[in-house]
Amino acid sequence: MIIAIVAVVIFLLNFLTPYGYMPMMGYGGGMMGYSDERYYPPGCCQGPAESSSNGGSMITKPSTGACQGGR
């Protein structure tokens, strides 16, 4: 239960910060499986994976900076 709470807190911190809380969380909570590159090819700006809810991906994929704030 404690682990779940910590995971949610980390995810929310990542969600609320523009570049993600930590680089290791660079996939919008990568350990939870929200990896944009798992569902979309590199550089793809379509779909929710590149939205601000996955802002952490911007630190690992700076070339897609044009996709920032694309909610």
From Swiss-Prot:
Residues 49-71 have a biased composition (Polar residues). One of its GO terms (cellular component) is membrane. The keyword Transmembrane applies. Its main location: membrane. Keywords: Membrane, Transmembrane, Transmembrane helix. It is found in: Membrane. This is Uncharacterized protein AF_0146. It comes from Archaeoglobus fulgidus (strain ATCC 49558 / DSM 4304 / JCM 9628 / NBRC 100126 / VC-16). The chain crosses the membrane at residues 2-24. It is a single-pass membrane protein.
